[in-house]
Amino acid sequence: METLSNIVKDLRTERDLSQGKLAELVGVTRQTIISLEKGSYIPSLLLAMKISEVLEAPIEEIFKKESM
């Protein structure tokens, strides 16, 4: 089974963004960001691209496929 890990929380805190502010900037709810950071939500490509733009990091750096 494969999962998608991410470093959204690390990058978000490095940039001094709250979950709510990141959610606002990418057009989702704070709960979506919480779920994403926990790994229980896999974003659409469009959302991943928006997060990449806001966090100023390449998508492939933020999101990584892992085998379990």
Predicted regions and their residues:
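Short basic helix-loop element that most often maps to the first helix and adjoining turn
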Residues: 6-25
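Key DNA-contact positions within bacterial/archaeal DNA-binding proteins
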Residues: 20, 31, 60
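Recognition helix of helix-turn-helix/homeodomain-like DNA-binding domains
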Residues: 28-41
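DNA major-groove recognition helix of helix-turn-helix/homeodomain DNA-binding modules
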Residues: 46-61
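Short, charged recognition helix plus adjacent turn
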Residues: 61-68
